[in-house]
Amino acid sequence: MVASFSWRLLSPRFLGGFVLGAAASSASCVAALQLYDKREPELAPVAPEEKDPLEEYGFPLTGTEARQYINHALAYDPAKRTPKWVIEHLSRTKTVGSADRKHCKFKPDPNIPKMFSATNEDYLGSGWTRGHMAPAGDNKFSTEAMAETFYLSNIVPQNYENNAGFWNRMEMYCRDLTKRFEDVWVVSGPLELPTSHEDGKKRVTYEVIGADEVAVPSHLYKVILVREKGSEQPLAIGAFVVPNSPIGFDHQLPEYKVQLEDLEKMSGLLFFPQLDRDKGLKPLCDVDSCRLIQLHEFKLYIAARRVGGARNLQKLERILSELKEEGITPDGYLLDLYEKKRKEFSLKSGTDRDERKG
């Protein structure tokens, strides 16, 4: 029996099984040791991060972060209830269309907290008009975009003659630039500039209006950047500062030209910060006329707007009659509008007669 057992012990099958078993056992041990070595180390408890007492309840919010709308963006000054700056992009396609300001109303911006917003009542009886920084006329392509320009976050108290006159002519000039340039960017805003007093000191003082004490600016500014079709780099830039007071038609835009750096010092703003100013950027008035329309041209423009809004033939005829009394000859554009409107009234009158007969 011993011999039989010895034979079995020395048999290849037994030895092979032993070797395989031993190898498997050894492998299992090695694997176990490896798994043991790979165990996640026990982490020491992390002490809670100490908060700086300065930050415990947050820093004051200025409310001047940029707010974006369909075709303009702005930074709002909640203390003065006016914008600090308003930027817009103009192109030929945006300044034409069927959008009409008669469907728009001035109202508080729903994005501005009520406690920081101006209201229409602030302007009522104040002697100041509600002056657009991004004008409604730059958004003929979209009724919604035009309506957003009537938010009071885009409005400053403005002298009536300035708003309807020189500032309006500046806005018209910006729109006219889209006929000569592919892209036009305009940044507009209010300024409260210091004045010298008898004691030799300079002071910043400004009127406030209404229960919300909306700040009346002493000056207004525009920065105009233009780019030609097919170009990646803008061609020219111009900066202008005008007083918030009447300016007659005998004045032209170059009279109010300032260095961009000077305006940046006045406003505390850096305009177009991603613009490379070293790449051959030219002064706007060197590459374009900077010419604002003259009085007779302006009256033709106003007459054309009145023709479009005329509600009967009598009012339509009166518009042309008043122009002739002032010695102004209607241009082709105005006469075309007049004829189109007159035909509309004639057609409506004929339809009304037919309905009465029926």
Swiss-Prot record:
Active site residues according to the UniProt entry: H132
E.C. designation(s): 3.1.30.-
One GO-annotated biological process of the protein: apoptotic DNA fragmentation
Cellular-component GO terms for this entry: mitochondrial inner membrane; nucleus
Key word Nucleotide-binding present: no
Coiled coil (UniProt feature): none
Keyword hit for Repeat: no
Compartment(s): Mitochondrion inner membrane
UniProt enzyme class: hydrolase
Pfam family, one: Exog_C
Main location per the UniProt record: mitochondrion
Residues annotated to bind a divalent metal cation: N163
InterPro entries to which the protein is assigned, alphabetical: DNA/RNA_non-sp_Endonuclease_sf, Endo_G_ENPP1-like_dom, ENPP1-3/EXOG-like_nuc-like, Exog_C, His-Me_finger_sf, Non-specific_endonuclease
Cofactor dependence: a divalent metal cation
Keywords: Endonuclease, Hydrolase, Membrane, Metal-binding, Mitochondrion, Mitochondrion inner membrane, Nuclease, Transit peptide
Molecular function terms from GO: 5'-3' exonuclease activity; metal ion binding; nucleic acid binding; RNA endonuclease activity; single-stranded DNA endodeoxyribonuclease activity
Domain of life: Eukaryota
Function according to Swiss-Prot or TrEMBL: Endo/exonuclease with nicking activity towards supercoiled DNA, a preference for single-stranded DNA and 5'-3' exonuclease activity.
Subunit structure: Homodimer.
Leftover remarks: The active site contains 1 hydrated divalent metal cation that has only 1 direct interaction with the protein; all other interactions are via water molecules.
Family: Belongs to the DNA/RNA non-specific endonuclease family.
Name of protein: Nuclease EXOG, mitochondrial
Source organism of the structure: Xenopus laevis (African clawed frog)
Lineage of the organism: Eukaryota, Metazoa, Chordata, Craniata, Vertebrata
